[in-house]
């Protein structure tokens, strides 16, 4: 367990937990990524043709975009030319950038070479500006790649924005030094980093498959945290959140990979996969429903082959809209 308090920080100020807009990237080159499979135990190949996989992934993506928009969430589709080498995981944009309410764009170092090809900040900024978002400043942590030190954005960091706190499970994709550098840059006063362990003994590749934080709730697979750290993490979350504990089996169905969002009229919704929805107990679904309308999306192809689910497909946009 490591709790790092940033020095000389102001008292945490209010910040929105839920974004009203998200970036989504179409899975135009989607397929099994052998590079990421080295430490992502959630990936599994399917005995389907590449063409069938692409068709199914695109259909799942389009249905999710339409469902979010119908619910009132602003979805920005970031398309890109097929000119920089294959990017089979581009559908998971939340791993290479994050945004703030102050209009700041942060770029993050990713562990796998073919995932670094996804990083297209100029094209992203152009797309966002065309959609009326004010991008005021860019910060890059990409230089850490040369040191083999990685921090895969909101894949490895689960943010409690109002409390200026970052929760992070340490792994090959979450380096403690880079984590603390980012926390200092963003002005977050508290970093709670911890170990995780699958039944195989390996760490969980991304924190956001085992936990999610909403405005007044959190979902966490606390049994994946060693006992000597578990109590502290749960106690920290429980200070002002309803804690919903999920099992390893539920985590494997992506119950931790969910995201609370806000609609244009200020209503809360919770995006999740159909697999996760079916794996939650009725009691848990009722608990979640008190925090927002549940939006389950069927993304079985993307989940199985990509090893990531609905939350991984959503990069939150906290940028202000231009007047």
Regions inferred by a protein language model and the residue ranges of each:
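The feature marks the mature, well-folded catalytic cores of soluble enzymes
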Residues: 1-323
């Amino acid at each position: 367990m490591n709790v790092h308090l940033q020095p000389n920080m102001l008292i945490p100020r209010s910040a929105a937990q839920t974004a009203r807009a998200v970036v989504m990237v179409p899975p135009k080159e989607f397929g099994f990524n052998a590079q990421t499979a080295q430490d992502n135990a959630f990936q599994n190949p399917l005995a389907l043709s590449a063409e069938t996989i692409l068709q199914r992934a695109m259909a799942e993506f389009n249905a999710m975009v339409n469902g979010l928009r119908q619910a009132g969430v602003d979805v920005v589709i970031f398309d890109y030319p097929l000119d920089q080498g294959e990017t089979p995981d581009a559908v998971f944009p939340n791993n290479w950038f994050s945004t703030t309410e102050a209009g700041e764009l942060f770029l993050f170092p990713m562990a796998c070479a073919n995932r670094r090809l996804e990083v297209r900040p100029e094209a992203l900024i152009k797309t966002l500006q065309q959609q009326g978002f004010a991008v005021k400043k860019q910060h890059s942590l990409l230089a850490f790649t040369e040191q083999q030190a990685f921090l895969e954005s909101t894949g490895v960091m689960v943010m409690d924005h109002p409390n200026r706190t970052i929760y992070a499970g340490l792994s090959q994709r979450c380096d403690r030094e880079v984590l603390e550098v980012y926390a200092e840059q963003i002005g977050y006063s508290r970093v709670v980093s911890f170990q995780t362990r699958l039944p195989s003994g390996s760490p969980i590749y991304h924190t956001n498959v085992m936990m999610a934080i909403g405005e007044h709730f959190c979902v966490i697979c606390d049994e994946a945290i060693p006992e000597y750290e578990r109590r502290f993490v749960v106690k920290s979350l429980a200070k002002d959140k309803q804690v919903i504990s999920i099992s390893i089996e539920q985590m494997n169905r992506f119950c931790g990979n969910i995201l609370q969002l806000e609609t244009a009229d200020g209503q809360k919704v919770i995006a999740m996969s159909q697999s996760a929805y079916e794996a939650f107990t009725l009691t848990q679904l009722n608990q979640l429903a008190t925090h927002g309308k549940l939006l389950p999306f069927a993304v079985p192809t993307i989940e199985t082959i990509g090893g990531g689910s609905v939350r991984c497909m959503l990069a939150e946009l906290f940028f202000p809209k231009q007047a």
